Amino acid sequence: MKKIKFLTIIAIVAISYSCNNSELQGMLNESETGIIVSEEEKAKFQNQIETFNTFTKGFYNEDIDLLMGVMADSAKWSPPSYNGNKVLDVVDFRAAVTNYFDTFDKITFNEGEGLVGSDNAFWSGSLYSAGETNTDPSVMRVYGTWSMVHTKTSAPVYNKWYGVLTFNEDGKIAVFSDWMDVGGMETQIQNFVDVNSHVCDENCGKEGHVCPHHPEIN
């Protein structure tokens, strides 16, 4: 009888260990690296992603109030075009957004598009850094591709994009720096106009005739 009880206890311990082993191993790994992410930090990171999604929804819907609602009143902005590294304020940012609304339609952010080997658009914290290792999610890096349609010409425009956003204690964007090829957008529009404004003569499409604007039928 004692032997049976002993075996029963061993079985219970084994089952309990099996159920909790993965969690325990995770804790051990965290202790070895010194990186322990709290549930509060995880929740804060997810809230920041939701805030950025509201930001991009404001672009798509051309809703300036929705978009600016996630920006702090004292927000600072470093724009994608080089301006001597001059930091702009929230008024300048609002004016730039309004200009995009006036110039483009269907402004859409495609999360993670353009990355190689990963589709994770959002990153925070720093395990490997020139500074100190930390798990603070307040500074978030975002990667993706913006797509839109030029209102005047209907030209489709795409731009690979990278942004660094710092969130304040209220969960709003307090500092915003972004990088993209602004001049490349103008080039895409001009190329579209050049191709679609060409009027072919009666020889276009005929054998032996080379049309630089319609290489698919040459």
Predicted regions and their residues:
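Sec-dependent signal peptide hydrophobic core
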Residues: K5-A11
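C-terminal motif of bacterial Sec signal peptides marking the signal peptidase cleavage site
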Residues: I15-S18
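C-terminal and inter-domain tail/linker signature
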Residues: I4-K5, N20-N218
